[in-house]
């Protein structure tokens, strides 16, 4: 059963819950009647603090906040390329098809297309020993991007007991089953969820040394970017 809390106070995008809600830090929650997406950012002396990622106008004390039990996460898999997302991986182009240019509050759309089938090459077979980072499938996402699906870092070493043949699969369809050393089994798909607050582990990171010339003088002069690097221009929450 989902844990819930009651809104005690609201200050812009920040919502306060009084009492022991049972939520965890970084847990994803749904706020109010419109199920606005939020994240638990503070737990202190019987007070829970939630940051809401949408406009809070009209939200009132007494409304319910429902926990998901999971950290706020994104879905990693084929279909990310060519998509435009907001900060919590909502696909803006898909939302625009249903709600127009202005996003309605509380709108919920799958981050990636869960119905589309991708032709995939399964790179492991029964009996193979796999561990975190082992490539289990390759999908030609675009003409130049080969998407490689891997064993998640959270799964320890195990043995493949079932592997699907090469073919067309949705991103959530099980393609490989592994038996862990403790005897439990895990089904893996082309896509996997990953908490946004936890950095993805890397074996080797190449330094970014080639400039990315944007043609925008304020960026190229004051905020130069590197090819292969990461940049963000943050705005206000809920705007």
Residue ranges and their predicted role:
Residues 21, 57, 72, 122, ...:
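Residue "hotspots" at secondary-structure boundaries inside conserved domains
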Residues 233:
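Hydrophobic anchor at the beta1->P-loop junction of P-loop NTPases
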Residues 239:
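ATP-binding Walker
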Residues 97-153, 170-230:
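P-loop NTPase nucleotide-binding/switch module
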Residues 1-96, 101-104:
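N-terminal accessory targeting/assembly segments
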Residues 20, 34, 70-71, 89, ...:
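Short, surface-exposed secondary-structure boundary micro-motifs
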Residues 42-48, 78-89, 145-166, 185-201:
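Short, compositionally biased
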Residues 13-18, 49-54, 114-125, 159-164, ...:
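Short alpha-helix capping/helix-loop boundary micro-motifs
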């Amino acid at each position: 059963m989902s844990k819930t809390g009651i809104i005690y106070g609201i200050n812009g995008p920040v919502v306060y819950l009084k009492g022991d809600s049972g939520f965890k830090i970084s847990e994803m929650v749904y706020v109010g009647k419109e199920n606005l997406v939020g994240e638990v950012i503070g737990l202190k002396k019987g007070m829970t603090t939630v940051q809401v990622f949408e406009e809070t106008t009209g939200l009132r004390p007494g409304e319910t906040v429902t926990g998901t039990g999971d950290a706020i996460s994104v879905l990693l898999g084929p279909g990310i390329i060519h998509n435009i997302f907001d900060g919590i991986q909502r696909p803006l182009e898909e939302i625009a098809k249903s709600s127009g240019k202005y996003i309605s509050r509380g709108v919920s759309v799958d981050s990636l297309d869960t119905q589309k089938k991708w032709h995939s090459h399964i790179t492991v077979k029964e009996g193979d020993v796999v561990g975190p980072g082992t490539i289990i499938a390759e999908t030609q996402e675009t003409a130049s991007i080969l998407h490689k699906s891997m064993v998640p870092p959270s799964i320890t070493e195990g043995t493949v007991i079932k592997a699907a043949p090469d073919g067309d699969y949705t991103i959530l369809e099980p393609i490989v089953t592994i038996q862990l050393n403790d005897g439990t089994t895990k089904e893996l798909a082309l896509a996997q969820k990953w908490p946004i607050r936890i950095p993805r582990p890397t074996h080797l990171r190449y330094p970014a040394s080639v400039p990315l010339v944007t043609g925008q003088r304020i960026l190229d002069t004051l905020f130069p970017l590197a090819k292969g690097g990461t940049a963000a221009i943050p705005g206000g929450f809920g705007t």
